[in-house]
Structure formats: structure tokens, C-alpha cells
């Protein structure tokens, strides 16, 4: 088991203090990492309003051919969405009503996750009628599973728990894994996030007033509850999305946190799904929430933008 290293918060304080000395504002959506700012989540490269059928969209995954697969947390339907337009191109039924929270394609097998921890695999999913098998495993009862991702380096599926995974891990957030070859679930978490490490007293640090004001009601990360998860196909980094705190964490494969983004509320009403394409572009879906319509946002890696854009965004 890897306990996620949160010693980076000391470095984070230094980064914020430096920002306070050089700028009067620190826009939400930019990273406060220990290494770089690969994405700017206040500046989407594309934004799509999704069909009303997807008001409860909860899971997102690339399924090939520039298409996204999506599920919503009420009905057992698989939605195929054109990533370039946000339009639904196909809908296929795979099961009855249920709280479906995650979806992921691993090689040619599609996995769909329910909040009770049940995982269904579909070897032949690109057909009019989907027939799947339930993966036999036993997650902790209080896990409330909401994220599933394929870690290709280990040939395993990762499952994130929204709630505390039991007494021995009280107050922590866990990520379990099951081996694709055997279907066996790890008995202990492969990653363990201690949310107590995310408590951060703003008053103890000399941030400027703009930063202090923005962080005052959002820096307490004790409410961090993973709602979506994705593995970067190029780097193997793990991205954990949280609706409650409107934030996004990036971890390396050793479990070290390398970046934190606070997501601007005007773009992220209820972020639930996340997927990353082979180019490194991040797609995040929002349930309808107060806006009354769901959205799909695309963010390109900052390193892929022109140098002039990078300079402009940093000013």
C-alpha cells in the first residue's frame, strides 16, 4: 500500500507566498504544484452543452475513434459521445436502473462501475445489445465507489472510494485495485490519502489579500471526496477529481501529490467525470446541477500551447 505523500504542502505555501509577492491575483484554475503548471482549468479550449439525457452524467472514458463513452447515475445506458462536438452518436442499454458512477476502457474490454462497488465487464461492447459479466470482488461496504481507471503499467483497474473505507482507515480516502488477469481485488488499498494532511491554516501564511480571500472557504480539503479518476496515458499520473471541494489532484504512480488545482465554480458546477486522451487533453463533465444543463469541457496541456500563450497566461 502506498500512503500518499502530502509533504508537498510546505512547498505549496512557498509557491503561494511567492505569488503574493509578485502578483495581486492568483486565478482559480491554475495549479499550485511542486513542479509545473501543465493545465489551466480556468481556460477551456472547448465547452459543450450536453443533451438533456446526460443531465446526470457521472462517468467518462475514451473508447476509441475520437469517441467518449459515458454513463449516468440513474439508468443502465451507455452513451457514445463525439469528443469533437459533444453530440451523442449512439445509445446502448447494458442493464437496469442503478447508480452507475464510472466507466473505463482497458484494451478492448469496457468496465462499468456502480456506487455499491459492483463492476461489470463487457468484452463485446461495441454491439447493439451489451452482455456483460460481473467482476467478483468485495469492496468495503462504506466505500461508495465513484471512480474507475485503468493502470496499464500494472494491468489493473483502480477503484476510488468517495467515503471512508472502514474503521482501520477512518478519515482517509482509499484506492483499491483488481488484477485484470485474475479479477482478484487487493485486500488493502494500493493508495491511501490522509485527508487530515489537507487541512491548511490560511492565517499562518503571508498570502496577499486576493489569495487569502479566494482560499478562505476552500482551502480546507477535509471534504475531498473523489468523484472521478483517470490515468494520464503518457505519464501514468493519476488524476483525482472532487465535486465537493471543486478540486483536482495529480499524483505520480508512487502516490506522491504533484499538483493541486482549485476549479472555478463558474465552469465547474458539479464535476463528476474525467477522461484524458492520447494527446494529454483532459475532458471533464459536469452534471446539470444548478445550471440545469450538463457540460463537457476540454483542456489542452499547457506545454502544447504556443510560447506566447504560456507567457500571456502567466501574467
Model-assigned labels for residue ranges:
Residues 8-16:
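Sec-dependent N-terminal signal peptides
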Residues 22-315:
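Sequence/structural signature of beta-propeller domains
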Residues 18-20:
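C-terminal motif of bacterial Sec signal peptides marking the signal peptidase cleavage site
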Residues 1-9:
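Bacterial N-terminal signal peptides that target proteins for export
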Amino acid at each position: 500500500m502506498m500512503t500518499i505523500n502530502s509533504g508537498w504542502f510546505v512547498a505549496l505555501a512557498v509557491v503561494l507566498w511567492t505569488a503574493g509577492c509578485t502578483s495581486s491575483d492568483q486565478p482559480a484554475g491554475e495549479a499550485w504544484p511542486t513542479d509545473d503548471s501543465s493545465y489551466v482549468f480556468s481556460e477551456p479550449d472547448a465547452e459543450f452543452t450536453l443533451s438533456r439525457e446526460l443531465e446526470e452524467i457521472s462517468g467518462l472514458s475514451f473508447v476509441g475513434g475520437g469517441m467518449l463513452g459515458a454513463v449516468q447515475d440513474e439508468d443502465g445506458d451507455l452513451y457514445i459521445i463525439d469528443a469533437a462536438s459533444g453530440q451523442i452518436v449512439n445509445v446502448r442499454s447494458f442493464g437496469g436502473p442503478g447508480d452507475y458512477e464510472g466507466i473505463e476502457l482497458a484494451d478492448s474490454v469496457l468496465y462499468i462501475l456502480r456506487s455499491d462497488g459492483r463492476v461489470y465487464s463487457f468484452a463485446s461492447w461495441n454491439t447493439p445489445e451489451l452482455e456483460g459479466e460481473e467482476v467478483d470482488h468485495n469492496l468495503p461496504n462504506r466505500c461508495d465507489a465513484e471512480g474507475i481507471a485503468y493502470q496499464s503499467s500494472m494491468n489493473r483497474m483502480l477503484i476510488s472510494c468517495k467515503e471512508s473505507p472502514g474503521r482501520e482507515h477512518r478519515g482517509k480516502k482509499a484506492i483499491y485495485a483488481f488484477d485484470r488477469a485474475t479479477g482478484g481485488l487487493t485486500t488493502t488499498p494500493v493508495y491511501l490519502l490522509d485527508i487530515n494532511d489537507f487541512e491548511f491554516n490560511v492565517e499562518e501564511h503571508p498570502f496577499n489579500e486576493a489569495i487569502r480571500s479566494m482560499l478562505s472557504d476552500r482551502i480546507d480539503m477535509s471534504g475531498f471526496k473523489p468523484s472521478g479518476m483517470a490515468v494520464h496515458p503518457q505519464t501514468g499520473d493519476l488524476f483525482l477529481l472532487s465535486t465537493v471541494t471543486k478540486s483536482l489532484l495529480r499524483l505520480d504512480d508512487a502516490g506522491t501529490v504533484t499538483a493541486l488545482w482549485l476549479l472555478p465554480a463558474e465552469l465547474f458546477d458539479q464535476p463528476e467525470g474525467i477522461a484524458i486522451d492520447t494527446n494529454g487533453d483532459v475532458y471533464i463533465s459536469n452534471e446539470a446541477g444548478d445550471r440545469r444543463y450538463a457540460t463537457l469541457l476540454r483542456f489542452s496541456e499547457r506545454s502544447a500551447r504556443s510560447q506566447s500563450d504560456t507567457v500571456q497566461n502567466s501574467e
